[in-house]
């Protein structure tokens, strides 16, 4: 059951990424049709913009991410218990030892960052280290180590970059149309050409809806990677109860004291900001109740 769940989560992520690239291609083709009278040119430009965004974000410095989240690096002497658990989980996962950071915050939370296992880091709040026992900490750190081993940070970064690219292309296309960039096409099409009018309307609709759809796909990818990391943590620790108990404590945690931006919020094991009341479709994290239920059903 454990390996089946891991496999299903990976497959869902692949499907979502394929849909994401298809959406980027669609928005590029639509913008190309409306502004350049050339589907192919718009499609190529969209993919190039997407790749530039993804590449620039993937190689963002680990130290910069930690600095943005008020995390300070610690040595084995400063936090031996935490350090050794990270070391043990990294050894079991067969990845290099990540750098270890602590965030001075009473809330219960942790996250990992780094585009590859070779430049990864793990951070935990002081609240988490104080409240959780060893088996619960192993579950949490196993979750973060799994994000590193599964290249989740890279996948999530690509998703954020693609969502940003879709939004930028849609915004540029909309502004150019508003200021007359599409007037030539509107004159050439003619009211009697029904097919062209339908194509024009569909292209406009895709420009309007693409940013929302892109955001929903990005958030869905983030939620799937959380489920995968939970299951992968159990694979590393061989102790589902440790992860379940940790999630039960995380469920009761207060929001973090310092502000957390959207990109950083998706990295944490638990939503670091005040819980929102709207649909889970717009959440970076699946409900903890569902995460616990999945672990119990393994």
Swiss-Prot record:
- Keyword Transferase included in the entry's annotation: no
Q: Which Gene3D superfamilies match?
A: Metalloproteases ('zincins'), catalytic domain (3.30.2010.10)
Q: Which GO terms describe its cellular component?
A: plasma membrane
Describe its membrane topology: Multi-pass membrane protein
Q: Which Pfam families match?
A: Peptidase_M48
**A GO biological process held by the record:** proteolysis
Into which family does the record put it? Belongs to the peptidase M48B family.
Protein name from the UniProt record: Protease HtpX homolog
Which species is this UniProt entry from?
Streptococcus pyogenes serotype M49 (strain NZ131)
């Amino acid at each position: 059951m454990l390996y089946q769940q891991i496999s299903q989560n990976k497959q869902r992520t692949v499907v979502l990424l394929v849909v994401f690239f298809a959406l980027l291609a669609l928005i590029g083709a639509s913008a190309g049709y409306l502004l350049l009278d050339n589907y192919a040119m718009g499609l190529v430009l969209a993919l190039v913009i997407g790749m530039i965004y993804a590449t620039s974000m993937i190689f963002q410095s680990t130290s910069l991410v930690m600095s943005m989240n008020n995390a300070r690096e610690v040595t084995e002497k400063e936090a031996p218990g935490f350090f050794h658990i990270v070391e043990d989980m990294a050894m079991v996962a067969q990845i290099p030892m990540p750098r270890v950071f602590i965030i001075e915050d009473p809330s219960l939370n942790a996250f990992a960052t780094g585009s590859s296992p070779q430049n990864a880091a793990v951070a935990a709040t002081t609240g988490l280290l104080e409240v959780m026992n060893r088996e619960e900490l192993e579950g949490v750190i196993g979750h973060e180590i799994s994000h590193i081993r599964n290249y989740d940070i890279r996948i999530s970064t690509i998703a954020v970059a693609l969502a940003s690219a879709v939004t930028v292309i849609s915004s540029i296309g909309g502004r150019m149309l508003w200021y007359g960039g599409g007037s030539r096409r509107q004159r050439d099409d003619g009211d009697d050409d029904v097919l062209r009018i339908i194509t024009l309307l569909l292209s406009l609709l895709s420009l309007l809806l693409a940013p929302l759809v892109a955001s929903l796909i990005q958030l869905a990818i983030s939620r799937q990677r959380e489920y995968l990391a939970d299951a992968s943590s159990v694979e590393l620790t061989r102790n589902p109860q440790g992860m379940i108990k940790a999630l039960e404590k995380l469920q009761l945690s207060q929001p973090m004291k310092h502000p957390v931006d959207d990109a950083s919020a998706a990295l944490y094991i638990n939503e670091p900001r005040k819980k929102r009341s709207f649909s889970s479709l717009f959440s970076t994290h699946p409900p903890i109740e569902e995460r616990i239920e999945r672990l119990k059903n393994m």
